[in-house]
């Protein structure tokens, strides 16, 4: 009997240890929000971004070397290009990306899909810069009945905005076509689609290069015309382990914003150089000027807009319930950098961890 009790005790101990090890494995995984020890500067940082004017801060920072300068020689910068938010979300959740410039909609999705564990929103990047542009003969929403409208990708920021707007306009017979922005430009020129809800510079390209006109500027749908088109997110584990690396990237972000404010011509040139390198073609002066006129580069994440953005996913039919966003924001690194630069702190609107 004593041997049997001893065997049961050993089994219980083994199970307890196994459970503890299992818990440790989850805590150390890429999808955990559990605190991790500060390990100093990262050996490398994988930075995601899009070849769009709405990601101007990222493009400027890469072109001018701001991120690399702020990171220093001890951290390798690995820029990683994406064309739409859902693909970047997959990279973040899979642990193959550390920090990403991304649309507000996919950022919310990344937080929701990981049950609030894997990512934190650490800064704003761009407000504005998205429009529904259409054929010249379309003068009102009701003219879109039975038509095809394009956007970049199912579930991305513009896809949610378009589908929400269509639902509010009761345009249930409009077909939404998800396709690459360059394909959209070609399709519009051929008359295959009636319009598209696009980020800059693509809305400007359809206007300047293909004769489209603006039916809806998304600015008109938001208070003060401000809404978060592009934000910056980080893997929670990377933030905990390498806070100084995160701060360095955010300093590069501030540098990019400063250039845009003090020397807009050079900021535009920097963006155009990056677009040429990434896509093989640069923007005409008319398109570049129009695209820049519709955006605001800002580190303010406009956190107060996010509950509405979450609800918009339900209205758009891409989510059954609005994701809960408490704990999504961690502006500690940003506010440290802003304070050092003598700038006012950013507000998380109660969506940070308490």
Name each region found by the language model:
Residues 31-178, 194-200, 216:
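Short, glycine-/small- and polar/acidic-enriched structural segments
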Residues 311-354:
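Conserved C-terminal helix/tail region of periplasmic/extracytoplasmic solute-binding proteins
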Residues 68-74, 220-225, 292-301:
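Short, solvent-exposed loop/beta-turn-alpha elements that line the ligand-binding surface or hinge
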Residues 1-22:
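Sec-dependent bacterial lipoprotein signal peptides
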Residues 27, 120-140, 223, 227-236, ...:
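Hydrophobic/proline-rich hinge and linker segments of small-molecule sensing/allosteric domains
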Residues 241-321:
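Secondary-structure end/capping motifs
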Residues 21-35:
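Bacterial lipoprotein signal-peptidase II cleavage site
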Residues 182-276:
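Pocket-lining segment of extracytoplasmic ligand-binding domains
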């Amino acid at each position: 009997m004593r041997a049997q009790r001893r065997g049961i005790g050993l089994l219980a101990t083994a199970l307890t240890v196994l459970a503890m090890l299992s818990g440790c494995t989850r805590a150390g995984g890429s999808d955990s929000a559990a605190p991790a020890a500060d390990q100093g500067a990262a050996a490398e940082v994988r930075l995601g971004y899009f070849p769009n004017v709405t990601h101007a801060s990222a493009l400027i920072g890469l072109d001018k070397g701001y991120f690399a300068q702020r990171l220093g020689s001890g951290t390798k910068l690995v820029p990683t290009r994406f064309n739409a938010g859902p693909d970047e979300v997959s990279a973040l959740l899979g642990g193959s990306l550390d920090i990403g410039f991304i649309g507000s909609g996919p950022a919310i999705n990344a937080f929701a899909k990981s049950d609030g564990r894997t990512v934190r929103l650490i800064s704003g990047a761009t407000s504005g810069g998205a429009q529904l542009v259409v054929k010249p003969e379309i003068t009102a929403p009701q003219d879109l009945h039975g038509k095809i409208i394009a956007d970049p990708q199912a579930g991305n920021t513009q896809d949610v905005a378009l589908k929400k707007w269509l639902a509010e306009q009761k345009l249930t017979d409009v077909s939404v076509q998800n396709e690459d922005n360059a394909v959209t430009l070609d399709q519009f020129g051929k008359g295959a689609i009636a319009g598209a809800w696009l980020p800059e510079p693509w809305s400007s390209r359809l206007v300047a290069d293909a004769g489209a006109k603006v039916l809806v500027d998304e600015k008109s749908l938001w208070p003060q015309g401000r809404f978060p088109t592009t934000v910056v997110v980080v893997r929670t584990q990377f933030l905990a382990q390498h806070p100084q690396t995160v701060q360095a990237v955010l300093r590069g972000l501030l540098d990019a914003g400063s250039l845009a404010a003090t020397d807009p011509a050079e900021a535009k040139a920097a963006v155009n150089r990056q677009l040429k390198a990434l896509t093989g073609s640069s923007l005409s002066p008319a398109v570049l000027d129009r695209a820049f006129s519709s955006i605001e580069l800002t580190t303010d994440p406009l956190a107060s807009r996010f509950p509405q953005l979450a609800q918009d996913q339900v209205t758009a039919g891409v989510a059954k319930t609005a994701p809960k966003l408490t704990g999504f924001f961690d502006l500690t690194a940003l506010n440290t950098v802003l304070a050092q630069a003598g700038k006012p702190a950013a507000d998380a609107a109660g969506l940070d961890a308490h």
